[in-house]
Amino acid sequence: MKFELLFGVLLVTLFSYSSAEMLDDFDQADEDELLSLIEKEEARAKECTPRFYDCSHDRHSCCRSELFKDVCTCFYPEGGDNEVCTCQQPKHLKYMEKAAGKAKKFGGKIKKWFG
């Protein structure tokens, strides 16, 4: 009985040690993968297209506003056959940014009042 108990404790100890090493290996692999993704994103980043400028060359190049990224919107001007694309902020996002700004400002006042 003592031998079985000792063998069981040894087996559990070895199993926990090996699983801890495997988790460390997985954590290291996740960190390496995350760093490589960040490096790729930085290398991929280029100049963004400002609001109301032509974005037909790259429809995903619009700049970010305070909270949201602008959207490349395409349309046909009146009496024209050529499609025109510009970076614009959708109205619902514009209103959400205004509301967030007012909420932040109001939150600062409440914090100031109640210390």
Swiss-Prot record:
Disulfide bridge map: 48-63, 55-72, 62-87, 74-85
Superkingdom of this protein's organism: Eukaryota
The UniProt record lists the keyword Transferase: no
Compartmental location: Secreted
Molecular function as annotated in GO: toxin activity
Primary localization class, coarse: secreted
GO cellular component terms, A-Z: extracellular region
Propeptide: 21-44
Protein name: U3-lycotoxin-Ls1k
